[in-house]
């Protein structure tokens, strides 16, 4: 799945990927590597190292005015990924908000043959770089690339011994404070890991591009995890010699143990990010010992890419609208028909539920309502009804055998007070049980049910419709299917507690203290009316499902009741 839409916001390739056809028409060296299919679509074989090298060199020349040479035996960098890293470093050091005339100093650990990070940083931002390299071939190519782009005054390439990271590289420049360091460490610990034999999930497809890196570029003792730990240990000695330390990671599983290492070492400022481009994802970790640095927020938890959510809908047939129009006469002075009468009844239901709503502008033959639900009142109504029935069931009654015995004989004055109480006539007892003393209030308001009605309410469990309103799971047409928020809802539940479990309580800590906001559209569809409910924002989409089901059931019950 392409990840280009998740690139850094300032990455020039985020919304405008390279135009291979245009580049091929302008650069003959690139043209020889492109392929054109029968539909005229231009493509590139990313498994061909020469094609990948041609693309990198062409993009640097076209978009940045840089001319470089890269040997096929060494790592060929992809431009969008490296540009993502440069932009993140800009965020770390506050480049966008700072005085552009201030000279920024950075270190590139293992700059590679292309020397791409210093070239991009110097060209885009005028940064000064100390670029280190252990490999002879990479060192020679890096120096050549710097010189042929006339950037020797901003980029210093130095050859360092094997396993040299920061400590030895900074011995000669003990007075300079650097703003940052960058590093693209060797990802793998051995050949098997580099080939994905013991590290790659077998379910993943094979890599779509070729790996051309040399031994020192792709492999190190202990892999990237141990390599970055060595940088961390160097930083513990250098501390404020650099404002920010950073490293790119090729494996997500390396991120957590490195963050834990920084925590154990007591590093005060830590952040991380994701680099997304094409079909490749990388991670980066940064830390600082300065108190005055601004720490960029890490990326929020990414959700699976989803199709746009369909609204929850149900249809009100023309025959139903006609019945609703007849019943709506007490509600309106003028006659209401069609979608107007459906909207009128929806507004009445919402008013009864105390759901805030107002009409908003919309298209022709359409009525729109904007809803703000403060509490889950549609569930409360059902709960109150069942609670009332339970209270009626629990009113004490005399046992049947006692009543029968009392009917057969009148009590004598010598009988116990309790028997006398039971023997009182109907005029001396309340209709619902024992007589009330003066000043006592009835426990249940309203008329008491008959024996028949009580037996009918013996099991006051929710009906199927009531369950559907509480559960929010009735499939109101097919568009309701799969409409729950999935991981988003689960996350919200973990943060605020489950809104459904709370049964309509206002959840603390929520701006405005509302459950959700949504938009109801009532549209004319031939002779019928289509009711759509669109999610806007809130705590849990299932609550909107419940309300939609409740409204639908109430409208249909209006017609069913004669």
Curated annotation (Swiss-Prot):
Protein name: RNA N(6)-adenosine-methyltransferase METTL16
Organism: Homo sapiens
Recorded GO MF terms: mRNA m(6)A methyltransferase activity; RNA binding; RNA stem-loop binding; U6 snRNA (adenine-(43)-N(6))-methyltransferase activity; U6 snRNA 3'-end binding
Sequence segments annotated as region (VCR 2): 514-562
Primary site of residence: nucleus
Phosphothreonine: modified positions: 463
Disulphide-bonded residues: none
Entry comment, domain topic: The VCR (vertebrate conserved) regions bind the first hairpin of MAT2A mRNAs. The VCR regions interact with the internal stem-loop within U6 snRNAs, inducing the conformational rearrangement of the A43-containing region of U6 snRNA, thereby modifying the RNA structure to become suitable for productive catalysis by the methyltransferase region. The K-loop region occludes the S-adenosyl-L-methionine-binding pocket. Upon activation, conformation of the K-loop changes, allowing S-adenosyl-L-methionine-binding.
Subcellular location: Nucleus; Cytoplasm
EC number: 2.1.1.348, 2.1.1.346
Reactions performed catalytically: adenosine in U6 snRNA + S-adenosyl-L-methionine = N(6)-methyladenosine in U6 snRNA + S-adenosyl-L-homocysteine + H(+); an adenosine in mRNA + S-adenosyl-L-methionine = an N(6)-methyladenosine in mRNA + S-adenosyl-L-homocysteine + H(+)
One cellular component (GO) term of this entry: cytoplasm
């Amino acid at each position: 799945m392409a990840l280009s839409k998740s690139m850094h916001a300032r990455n020039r390739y985020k919304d405008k990927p390279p135009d291979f056809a245009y580049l091929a028409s302008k650069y003959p060296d690139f043209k020889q590597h492109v392929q054109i299919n029968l539909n005229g679509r231009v493509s590139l074989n990313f498994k061909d190292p020469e094609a990948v090298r041609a693309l990198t060199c062409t993009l640097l020349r076209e978009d940045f005015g840089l001319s470089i040479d890269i040997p096929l035996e060494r790592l060929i960098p992809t431009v969008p990924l490296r540009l993502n890293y440069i932009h993140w470093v800009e965020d770390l050091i506050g480049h966008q908000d700072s005085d552009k005339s201030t000279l920024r100093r950075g270190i590139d650990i293992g700059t590679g043959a292309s020397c791409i990070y210093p070239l991009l940083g110097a060209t885009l931002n005028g940064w000064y770089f100390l670029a280190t390299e252990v490999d002879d071939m990479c060192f020679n190519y890096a120096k050549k690339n710097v010189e042929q782009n006339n950037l020797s005054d901003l980029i210093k390439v130095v050859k360092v011994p094997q396993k040299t990271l920061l400590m030895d590289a900074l011995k000669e420049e003990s007075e300079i404070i650097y703003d940052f360091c960058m590093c693209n460490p060797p990802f793998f610990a051995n050949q098997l890991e580099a080939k994905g034999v013991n590290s790659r999930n077998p379910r993943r497809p094979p890599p779509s591009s070729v790996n051309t890196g040399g031994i020192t570029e792709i492999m190190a003792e202990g892999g990237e995890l141990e390599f970055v730990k060595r940088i961390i240990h160097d930083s513990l000695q250098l501390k404020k010699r650099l404002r920010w330390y950073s490293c790119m990671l090729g494996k997500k599983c390396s991120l957590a143990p490195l963050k834990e290492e920084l925590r154990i070492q007591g590093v005060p400022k830590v952040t991380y990010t994701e680099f997304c481009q094409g079909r490749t994802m990388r991670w980066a970790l940064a830390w600082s010992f300065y108190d005055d640095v601004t720490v960029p927020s890490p990326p929020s938890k990414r959700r699976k890419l989803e199709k746009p959510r369909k609204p929850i809908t149900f249809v009100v047939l023309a025959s139903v609208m006609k019945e609703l129009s007849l019943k709506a006469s007490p509600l309106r002075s003028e006659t209401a028909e069609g979608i107007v009468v459906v909207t009128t009844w929806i507004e009445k239901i919402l008013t009864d539920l105390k759901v805030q709503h107002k009409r908003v502008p919309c298209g022709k033959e359409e009525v729109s309502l904007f809803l703000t639900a403060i509490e889950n009142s549609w569930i409360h109504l059902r709960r109150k009804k069942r609670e009332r029935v339970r209270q009626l069931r629990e009113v004490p009654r005399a046992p049947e055998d006692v009543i029968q015995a009392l009917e057969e004989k009148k009590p004598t004055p010598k009988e116990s007070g309790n028997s006398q109480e039971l023997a009182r006539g109907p005029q001396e007892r309340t209709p619902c049980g024992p007589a009330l003393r003066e000043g006592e209030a009835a426990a249940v308001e309203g008329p008491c049910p008959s024996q028949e009605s009580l037996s009918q309410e013996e099991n006051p469990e929710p009906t199927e419709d009531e369950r559907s309103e509480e559960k929010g799971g009735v499939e109101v047409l097919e568009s309701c299917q799969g409409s729950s928020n999935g991981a988003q809802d689960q996350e919200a539940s973990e943060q605020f507690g489950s809104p459904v479990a709370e049964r309509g309580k206002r959840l603390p800590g929520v701006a405005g203290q509302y459950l959700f906001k949504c938009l109801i559209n009532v549209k004319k569809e031939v002779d019928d009316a289509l009711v759509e409910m669109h999610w806007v924002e809130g705590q849990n989409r299932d609550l909107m499902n419940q309300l939609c089901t409740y409204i639908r059931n109430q409208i249909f019950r209006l017609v069913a009741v004669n």
